[in-house]
Design a protein with these regions (language model features):
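Active-site residues of response regulator receiver
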Residues: 55
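Receiver (REC) domain active-site loop signature in two-component systems and cognate sites
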Residues: 58
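Short amphipathic alpha-helix used as the core "switch/output" element in two-component signaling
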Residues: 42, 64-76
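Acidic catalytic/metal-coordinating carboxylates
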Residues: 35-36, 62-65
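Two-component/phosphorelay signaling modules centered on CheY-like receiver
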Residues: 14-32
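Non-catalytic signal-transmission and effector/linker regions of two-component phosphorelay proteins
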Residues: 1-6, 107-140
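Acidic, metal-coordinating helix/loop segments flanking the phosphotransfer/catalytic sites
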Residues: 33-51
Length: 140
């Protein structure tokens, strides 16, 4: 059985956070959810986080600053930034994926998470092939 991946979810909107947490947990992920970026950053420092999903606009530290702080600690951690603002994505952000709230289906978020986790893990290692003795190649 493969170990469950842990996703750090951050959103100051408790309803959105609760929905996202339930959606991810029912798909087999462990979820650490926080309404404050500062608390989420402290949890991240404890380790065992595989991916970050955060809202963009929050009181205190906003989503892009949270992602930057996390990537200062662990540069290869995948991060998804979600915004309710339908504005142009801030290309200075270190997020790997940007999703406009209300403009994506839950299945889109789940697929992005899956792809980012696969990319983080890297390609499956191929087992070296055992050379076949001459004369057996193509023999049935």
């Amino acid at each position: 059985m493969k170990p469950k991946r842990t996703i750090l979810c951050v959103d100051d909107n408790e309803q959105s956070l609760s929905y996202r947490k339930i959606m991810l947990e029912t798909r087999g992920y462990r979820v650490a959810s926080y309404t404050r970026s500062e608390d989420a950053l402290e949890r991240f420092k404890k380790g065992d986080i595989d991916l970050v999903v955060t809202d963009m606009a929050m009181p205190g530290m906003d989503g892009p600053h949270l992602i930057a702080a996390i990537k200062d600690i662990s540069p290869h951690i995948p991060a998804i930034l979600i915004s309710s603002k339908a504005r142009v994505y801030d290309h200075d952000s270190q997020a790997d994926v940007f999703l406009a709230r209300g403009m994506y289906a839950p299945a889109d978020l789940l697929e992005r998470i899956r792809l980012l986790l696969v990319r983080k893990r890297g390609p499956k290692r191929l087992q070296p092939r055992q050379p076949q003795p001459p004369g057996q190649i193509g023999a049935a």
